[in-house]
Amino acid sequence: MSISNMTSTVWPDLQVPAIEHNHLPILTVALLTGIASAVYINVSSVQDPCKVGSIPTVKRPRLLDAYRSGVWWRIFVPRLVPYIEEGYHKYNKNDQPFRIWLGGFQAYAYVLPERYLDKIKNMPESEASFAAMANKYFHTGLPTGEVNNLVLQVASKLVNGNLATIKTLMQGEVQKALAREIGSPRQWTKINAWQVARKTTEAPGLRVVFGEELANDKTFVTGVSEFVSNITVYAFTLRYINLGPLRDFILYLVHWRHRRSLPAVLTPLNNVITERKKVRSNRHISDDEESFDCIQWALDQPVSDDCKTAEAIARRLVVISLGTIDTVAGVLVKQLTHLASHPECHEEIRAEIRECLAEDDNGWTLKSTGRMKKLESFIQESLRMSSGAISLSGMRIVTGSGFRLDDNTVLPRDSFIAIPTRNILYDPEVFPEPEKFDPFRFYKIKEDEKNAGSRSNRRDIRASWLAFGYGRQACPGRFYAINAMKTILGEILLKYDIRLAEKQAPRIDIDLDPMLAPVRSTDLEFRVRA
């Protein structure tokens, strides 16, 4: 039976023209192509039972991005922020997820719309894990050791739980650091903003993590400073090149030089830990004799013995120091630049600080800083404008059997999920005039909510402040970081006038997929207040 006759039998109303003999090769190719396509679609559906392939992809063309940005090296490291913005408005705003390639992680991120915040808020690590994401994509195990429960317990429970006492230490260390780095210049003096941020966060960070003895050891401090400073540099060396199956081996070799500098930190730290364990084994230590630092808190943790060896604790404390020093400094330098760019808010914030400190004779306590709502608003607005250290938050690796998006789509185990922080924070439906820096934006929002009381229909704006992550797996050291920023910025405002060294406001950060790296070349000018 000919094709024409067969078609007429099945669909009698369909008129099919007679097929000429010389058209048969073309039809044969078309038929085979159709069969191949059907087989491919069928096989693809079998290989993709969760239908992840149905999630749209936002592409990042390298050549086009280099042309658009006017920067030649964007061929190798294309920007991330503009393309997440594209996906946010095209898909997330329509309540759809999308995926985008992260060159720094060599993996696709599934970027979820805001409605999934409630779902990830209380997800346990057994279902989706931030620590697993950090270990896999930041390769924390290469230089020091993977993030584990000891790190999370010390950072989240003990550092945050002892903030009341830490605040006293923090104030003293910050004041000494400012005296060293800025001094008391009576004329406007140019100083690098990154240097100020780094040294003022380093001083309290070293004291809290490593204790008074090591924090005053110049050789140890230099070793920690150099090692921590290089973590981010080494973390992204060769990350943007697809190394295939040799990736882990090559990255291990890249970190070899970095690991060589680790003994300068670990040896004295091991000695202190070993000595403390020895003293505790020989006699009872009273509460008054207990050291007040992360070393002691790590020793007190109910974890397995193999996690409490001197070497294991030392390596994990180095990981914690990265968060208390380098990460906080990277955010603080942006806040210093914002502060210098907006002198119109200085006096109002100073007045509030003086009033709050006067009400509490003990100085920078949790109680007094908790009342500094305008200073807090400034910090929140700076974080909103700069998105902290990264343009995505809520980053997790799916560790359970899957992450269900809807009835038809499940992200399988090992999928990388995230929330588009920067775009939510720049959404005019969330924050009116998002491009404008309003230092008292959050102060006014909270005042409006307080005045409206239960009658307020305002959206919960706190759910959109995502710079420190979200939910039970948000940044474990966020309360320490916020209090450090308050203390440092407050002390600077009380003691100094501050302004930009250049008339034009400098660039705040650089889009380095996925990081928003701070610009370290910005200079500010300081002058001691009369």
Swiss-Prot record:
Keywords: Glycoprotein, Heme, Iron, Membrane, Metal-binding, Monooxygenase, Oxidoreductase, Transmembrane, Transmembrane helix. Cytochrome P450 monooxygenase; part of the gene cluster that mediates the biosynthesis of aspterpenacids. Performs the C22-oxidative modification of the terpene synthase sttA product preaspterpenacid I to produce preaspterpenacid II. It has still to be determined how preaspterpenacid II is further modified to produce aspterpenacids. Gene3D superfamilies: Cytochrome P450 (1.10.630.10). Its main location: membrane. CDD domains: CYP503A1-like. It is found in: Membrane. It catalyses: preaspterpenacid acid I + reduced [NADPH--hemoprotein reductase] + O2 = preaspterpenacid acid II + oxidized [NADPH--hemoprotein reductase] + H2O + H(+). Belongs to the cytochrome P450 family. GO terms for biological process: secondary metabolic process; terpenoid biosynthetic process. Pathway: Secondary metabolite biosynthesis; terpenoid biosynthesis. This is Cytochrome P450 monooxygenase sttB. Its cofactor is heme. InterPro entries: Cyt_P450, Cyt_P450_E_grp-IV, Cyt_P450_sf. Disruption phenotype: Abolishes the production of the ophiobolin family sesterterpenoid. GO terms for cellular component: membrane.
